[in-house]
């Protein structure tokens, strides 16, 4: 089956932030074949389990600004992400 890119919006209550009264959120990317597959992968994720996160929503990302997203499996299981903070971007 074809693998696709999904964004999973997760909520959790962190006792270190305001005593856990307010819900915090994080978005994580997963690769999967369908929504159920991605749901299961998200629930099995160690970070999700550690913080007792729950799934608020899942988005399938197929096209962005006219560009089709193609998932191409490479060797290894690592995730590679490049991050740039506001200060780095505002210098340009």
Label every model-predicted segment.
Residues 48-92:
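Short, mixed-charge low-complexity intrinsically disordered segments
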């Amino acid at each position: 089956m074809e693998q696709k890119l999904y964004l999973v919006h997760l909520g959790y209550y962190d006792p270190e932030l305001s005593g856990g009264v307010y819900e915090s959120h994080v978005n994580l990317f997963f690769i999967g074949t369908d929504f159920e597959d991605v749901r299961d992968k998200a629930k099995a994720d160690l970070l999700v389990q550690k913080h007792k996160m729950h799934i608020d929503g899942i988005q399938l990302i197929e096209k962005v600004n006219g560009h089709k997203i193609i998932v191409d499996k490479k060797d290894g299981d690592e995730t590679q992400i490049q991050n740039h903070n506001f200060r780095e971007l505002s210098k340009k």
